[in-house]
């Protein structure tokens, strides 16, 4: 008999690629294509310029983890973000970013994607995120949920 347990941040550290913990499950996200990747990069570059100009916060690019403490979510990994908290060294950032961006990929359209996006936006705001540009889906049709054993 196989039993599964709730995924932990430590599981994320051992997972290759981009992943988040949602409802206790480790959710892997597929790499994105040219256009959504370029859009995320451009937003990161704008946030980086803002951080340099204002000497406040940090622009955070894709594939970085933010550790949060919600009943249904333990982490975020936005496509771009602005963070004002302490440096985290080799670990995930603690808490949600001040501003987060999710860029919509090819499979991130339709009614179910809109519902997931609305839930992820609500999760960001519950964690203290001051703004979220929801141009993507927290889980597209191509994402994979892994059981944690």
Language-model segments: which ranges?
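Gly/Pro/Ser/Thr-rich low-complexity, intrinsically disordered segments predominantly at protein N-termini
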Residues: 1-149
